């Protein structure tokens, strides 16, 4: 039998005591408050401390740049080209006006100078494409001590380097193990809890247990990301029989919203860890998972959504109509399907603060586990959630117009750019219809001029 030396025995005892104390602190200050939705304000104090450190780091970099007579790089959040919201016809008329002394009424159907408009638009798109840059991480104006990829790294002083090294130790040696423990706890409880609840007979007790299992697990997962969430206008929270639509940045959007409400969810089938969670959740709650590539699945989803919203006793449905993750600088085209079924729509705007950590999931670059590890090694996830007043489809509106109206309201409230482009361009080539649209607009302008002159 192997015997421990006194010194080894002391180390084992100290390790056991340390783990017991750590687990007790974890239980008392994080897990139990998460279960009951209580906060001690530790995360907000942590956020305020980080803001002071970031401000000091920015001042140090500015001072270093001034000493070397350099100018700090400032990213252009709205693009590098100033663009006014003008139509094709107005811009072509402006080019004709500046290049010809003739009156516009006497101009022919086509002028050679019109070519310059299309050449300029092509060059602008190459230099500053407003679509594809929505599928990459948002640039920061100042360094957030997460990496040395900031353009101003050459102005980092010795003090900042030491601070960065200390930050790495804190994030990887303290925060990461703590967050992994919390995430494992939350996900395990969610999978086990929803599986057990799924065996209960349908009724109020099953609904009660399902609701509280979901809320408890999502709140623990929120703590695993050190998420600091501010909810606004909670009186507008989605109600039964309605549809909750929100802009989509990341899979953690679900955790952010579901930690403050109970939803039936609609989403694409995933594999891996996400697939395990989806299969467990659907046992306890009527979530709808579908395969995007299957046409019959889409028709089935539309039918199930219609049946769901007709029953006012059923949970509100949570949908992300963009259909893909956008980097939280804009809102892209909403798919019209969820706006065709005639239900009350509850818009929700979600805005993340990128200086604490980039919440955007670039699914073409990172898998789910890799993405979660990136989140858990960031400083925190800080975001604001606005519940907007419910909206209904007007008599003279079609589904596309209604979807655009809801999208505009979300973009306006969240301070996001409202784009008409389809987020599906993230995975697909530009359709010919987009190219033909510009040709149609130009042809309409030419034909219109010709008809006007024929009448005269």
From Swiss-Prot:
It catalyses: sn-glycerol 3-phosphate + an acyl-CoA = a 1-acyl-sn-glycero-3-phosphate + CoA; dodecanoyl-CoA + sn-glycerol 3-phosphate = 1-dodecanoyl-sn-glycerol 3-phosphate + CoA; sn-glycerol 3-phosphate + hexadecanoyl-CoA = 1-hexadecanoyl-sn-glycero-3-phosphate + CoA; sn-glycerol 3-phosphate + octadecanoyl-CoA = 1-octadecanoyl-sn-glycero-3-phosphate + CoA. Its main location: endoplasmic reticulum. The keyword Membrane applies. Glycans are attached at residues 247, 327-328, 362. The chain crosses the membrane at residues 156-176, 180-200. Disulfide bonds: none annotated. One of its GO terms (molecular function) is lysophosphatidic acid acyltransferase activity. Its EC number is 2.3.1.15. GO terms for cellular component: endoplasmic reticulum; endoplasmic reticulum membrane. Residues 1-37 form the signal peptide. GO terms for biological process: CDP-diacylglycerol biosynthetic process; lactation; lipid biosynthetic process; triglyceride biosynthetic process. It is a multi-pass membrane protein. Keywords: Acyltransferase, Endoplasmic reticulum, Glycoprotein, Lipid biosynthesis, Lipid metabolism, Membrane, Phospholipid biosynthesis, Phospholipid metabolism, Signal, Transferase, Transmembrane, Transmembrane helix. Pathway: Phospholipid metabolism; CDP-diacylglycerol biosynthesis; CDP-diacylglycerol from sn-glycerol 3-phosphate: step 1/3. It is found in: Endoplasmic reticulum membrane. The keyword Acyltransferase applies. A motif (HXXXXD motif) lies at residues 248-253. InterPro entries: LPCAT1-like (IPR045252), Plipid/glycerol_acylTrfase (IPR002123). Belongs to the 1-acyl-sn-glycerol-3-phosphate acyltransferase family. Converts glycerol-3-phosphate to 1-acyl-sn-glycerol-3-phosphate (lysophosphatidic acid or LPA) by incorporating an acyl moiety at the sn-1 position of the glycerol backbone. Active against both saturated and unsaturated long-chain fatty acyl-CoAs. Protects cells against lipotoxicity. PANTHER family: GLYCEROL-3-PHOSPHATE ACYLTRANSFERASE 4, PHOSPHOLIPID ACYLTRANSFERASE. The HXXXXD motif is essential for acyltransferase activity and may constitute the binding site for the phosphate moiety of the glycerol-3-phosphate. This is Glycerol-3-phosphate acyltransferase 4. It comes from Pongo abelii (Sumatran orangutan).
């Amino acid at each position: 039998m192997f015997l421990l030396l006194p010194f080894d025995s002391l180390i084992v005892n100290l390790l056991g005591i340390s783990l017991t104390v750590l687990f007790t602190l974890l239980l008392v200050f994080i897990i139990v408050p998460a279960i009951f939705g209580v906060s001690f304000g530790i995360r907000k104090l942590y956020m305020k401390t980080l803001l002071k450190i970031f401000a000091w780091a920015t001042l140090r970099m500015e001072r270093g740049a001034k000493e070397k007579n350099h100018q700090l790089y400032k990213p252009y959040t709205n693009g590098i080209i100033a663009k006014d919201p003008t139509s094709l016809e107005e811009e072509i008329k402006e080019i004709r006006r500046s290049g010809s002394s003739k009156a516009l009424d006497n101009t022919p159907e086509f002028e050679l100078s019109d070519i310059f408009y299309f050449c300029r638009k092509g060059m602008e798109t190459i230099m500053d494409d407003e679509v594809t840059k929505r599928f990459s991480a948002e640039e920061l104006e100042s360094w957030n001590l997460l990496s040395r990829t900031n353009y101003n790294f050459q102005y980092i002083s010795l003090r900042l380097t030491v601070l960065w090294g200390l930050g790495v130790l804190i994030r990887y040696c303290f925060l990461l193990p703590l967050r992994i423990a919390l995430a494992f706890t939350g996900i395990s409880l969610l999978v086990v809890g929803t599986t057990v609840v799924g065996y209960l007979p349908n009724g109020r007790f099953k609904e009660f247990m399902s609701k509280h299992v979901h809320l408890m697990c999502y709140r623990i997962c929120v703590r695993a990301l050190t998420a600091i969430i501010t909810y606004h206008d909670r009186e507008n929270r989605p109600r039964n029989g309605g549809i909750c639509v929100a802009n989509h940045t990341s899979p953690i959007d679900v955790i952010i919203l579901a930690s403050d409400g109970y939803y039936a969810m609609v989403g694409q089938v995933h594999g891996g860890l996400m697939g395990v969670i989806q299969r467990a959740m659907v046992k306890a709650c009527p979530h709808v998972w579908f395969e995007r590539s299957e046409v019959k699945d889409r028709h089935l989803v539309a039918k199930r959504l219609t049946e769901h919203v007709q029953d006012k006793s059923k949970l509100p449905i949570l949908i992300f109509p963009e259909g893909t993750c956008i980097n939280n600088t804009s809102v892209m085209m909403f798919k019209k399907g969820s706006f065709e079924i005639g239900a009350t729509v509850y818009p929700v705007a979600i805005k993340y603060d990128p200086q604490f950590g980039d919440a955007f999931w670039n699914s073409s670059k990172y898998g789910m586990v890799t993405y979660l590890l990136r989140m858990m090694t960031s400083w925190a996830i800080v975001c604001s959630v606005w519940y907007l007043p419910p909206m209904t489809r007007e008599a003279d509106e079609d589904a596309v117009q209604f979807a655009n109206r809801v999208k505009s309201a979300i973009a306006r409230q969240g301070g996001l750019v409202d784009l008409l482009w389809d987020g599906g361009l993230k995975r697909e080539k530009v359709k010919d219809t987009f190219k033909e649209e510009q040709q149609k607009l130009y042809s309409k302008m030419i034909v219109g001029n010709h008809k006007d002159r024929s009448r005269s």
